[in-house]
Each structure stands twice: as structure tokens, then as C-alpha cells.
Amino acid sequence: MKAIDKMTDNPPQEGLSGRKIIYDEDGKPCRSCNTLLDFQYVTGKISNGLKNLSSNGKLAGTGALTGEASELMPGSRTYRKVDPPDVEQLGRSSWTLLHSVAASYPAQPTDQQKGEMKQFLNIFSHIYPCNWCAKDFEKYIRENAPQVESREELGRWMCEAHNKVNKKLRKPKFDCNFWEKRWKDGWDE
């Protein structure tokens, strides 16, 4: 299968996962905006004949396409060859970082800390590797200013921002009453 580039007349609009393929400004598939499976499909690393995916996103009978390679990097005893993160891995990791930052934010921040948090979130929305995700978060920040007066306000604001994304992705809403247990204190059990 030939790799897709910007010269292709009709690049795929949907990947093997069923998600819409996101292309960057140059018309090339965005690596961090698509799942690994879809990116490999549109770049020709796997073929359209791979429709027999199991429910966990792996090809039936193989461990392929999970993003985890069993080979070690050349000259390494510990580092494995792993592909760059896809949109799902990037999203999970980013939300983990953002929620953890909110959970460690002071209960009573100084004016400097408030300014730094606003600046961090603003910069984050500009540099996020998935361009359409970045624009969406930037828009959310414009329409819903980050609440940085306290840890409680920031944690709830972050939870609400995450739930907005979850809704777009048709994922269940997280009960923001539990944000501290999930991201700061842990569960009582």
C-alpha cells in the first residue's frame, strides 16, 4: 500500500478505528492527532485488509499495533523501541499532567502563582502537539477563563474542561465531586 501524502487526490477520511482522520496544515496525516492504528493505515504501514480488529484494538491473534515493541533500542538494555504517542495516549498523558498540576496547586496561591498558572495553561493550549486539540483547548480557555483563585476552583475547572472533551468524544462524564480523590488524596479503600 502506498503511503498517503499531500499529492493524493482522495486521502482516506476515516481510519480503521472508525475515527475521522486529522490532517495537518500541509495535508499530511497528523501523528499526534490520530490513533496509532489510523496513522499506520493512512501512511501505508498497514493495509485496509486489517478489518478483523478485536475489541481491544489489537489485530486478532497478534500483539501488533499496541505501540509497544518487544525489541530494545540499539545499545540499550532497558529502553524499548516505542512509537510516538497517538492522540489517545497523548490525551491520557496530558490530562494526567493537567489534573496532577491542579491537585498540587496551592489552596491559597499567591498572585504570582495565579499568573503563572494562567500563563502555563495559555502556553499549553498553544504548544499542544495535536493542532486541532490545541485550538479546541485554546477556545475553551477563551470562553471559560481558568479559575485560579484556589486549588478547589482550579481542580473543578480542570474537571469541567476534561468533561467537555469527554462529551465530544462520547465518553462518560466524570463526577467532579470526586476530583480530589482521583487526583490529589486517593480513594479511602
Curated annotation (Swiss-Prot):
Entry keywords, A to Z: Disulfide bond, FAD, Flavoprotein, Mitochondrion, Oxidoreductase
Residue positions binding FAD: 88-95, 99, 128, 159-171, 182-183
EC number, UniProt record: 1.8.3.2
BP term (GO), one: mitochondrial disulfide relay system
GO CC terms of this entry: mitochondrial intermembrane space; mitochondrion
Catalyses which reaction(s): 2 R'C(R)SH + O2 = R'C(R)S-S(R)CR' + H2O2
Top enzyme category: oxidoreductase
Keyword hit for Membrane: no
Superkingdom of origin: Eukaryota
UniProt main location, coarse: mitochondrion
Subcellular location as annotated: Mitochondrion intermembrane space
Disulfide bond sites: C130-C133, C159-C176
Effect of C133S: Loss of function
Molecular-function GO term, any one: flavin-dependent sulfhydryl oxidase activity
InterPro entries: ALR/ERV, ERV/ALR_sulphydryl_oxid_sf, ERV/ALR_sulphydryl_oxidase
Start and end residues of each ERV/ALR sulfhydryl oxidase domain: 83-183
Description of how the protein assembles with itself and partners: Homodimer. Interacts with MIA40, forming transient intermolecular disulfide bridges.
Known role: FAD-dependent sulfhydryl oxidase that catalyzes disulfide bond formation. Required for the import and folding of small cysteine-containing proteins in the mitochondrial intermembrane space (IMS). Forms a redox cycle with MIA40 that involves a disulfide relay system. Important for maintaining the cysteine residues in MIA40 in an oxidized state. Reduced ERV1 is reoxidized by cytochrome c. Required for the maturation of cytoplasmic, but not of mitochondrial Fe/S proteins.
Protein name, as recorded: Mitochondrial FAD-linked sulfhydryl oxidase ERV1
Species, as recorded: Saccharomyces cerevisiae (strain ATCC 204508 / S288c) (Baker's yeast)
Gene that this sequence comes from: ERV1
